[in-house]
Amino acid sequence: MKIDVPAGMVRQEVQLEAEEHERVDQQCLSIDPAVYGNVSAMLLIQKVTHRKKPVFGPVEDTTFYKIVGSKELKGDVVQQCDQIYETWKKVGMPLVCVDAGGLGVGYQPILARLRVQVRPITLHGGITSSNRNVSKTEMFSHMQRLFEQRAIRIGEIPHKLQLVNSLERFRATYLDDGRLVYSIKEVRGEHGDWACSCALGLWAMRRGPVVAVGYR
C-alpha cells in the first residue's frame, strides 16, 4: 500500500545530546617576585565554570582553574612593572595578585600609578590567614586540595615545563609537634617561584567578585 506524505512534511532526526559550554568567571595575573630580583614568575589563571545541559535532568555546573599563560619578568622593578602593565592591558585588565614581601613591595606604588588593580598578599609562617596576611600553610594546602580534586588544568603555556618541575618539587611534611610544613626544593637556583605564583593566584581567586567574560 502506498502512503502519501503531505506536502512540506520532511523526515527529521532528533539528536539527543547534552549542550556543553565554558564560562570564564574570573582572571588573575599572579606574580611571585624572584628572590634576587632577576627573573620573576607570572601566570595568567582563569576560574572557569563548565556548564552541561542534559536533554533530561538538571543543569550541571563544574568549577575549575585553568592556567592559560606564563611570562618571565626580567629587569629591575620598574621594567618588570612595565611588562606587567602591558600584559594586564592585553588580557583584559584582570586582578593582579602579588607576593607583597621583598621585591613585591616595590611593585605596588608603581602599579597603583598605572591604575592596575592589585591584591597584595603578605605571606607568613603561622597557621591562620586574614584578607592580606596569608599563612603559607593555608595557601599551599588550598592548592594541594585543588590538585587532589583535579580542579586545576595546565594549558600549553610557554613555561609549562618549569611550572610542572616546580610543582613536582613541592613537599608537605608533618613535624613532630603535628604541624604541617610545605617546602619546595631548590634546584640550580630556582626557588619554586612558579609553584608559588600558582598558589598565590589560586588563593586570590578562591572568593571575591566575579568578573563574567561570557560563555564560549
Cite the ranges covered by each PLM segment.
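RNase H-like, metal-dependent nuclease domains and their acidic two-metal-ion catalytic environment used
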Residues: 1-123, 130, 137, 150-216
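Conserved RecA-like P-loop NTPase helicase motor core
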Residues: 133-136, 140-142, 146
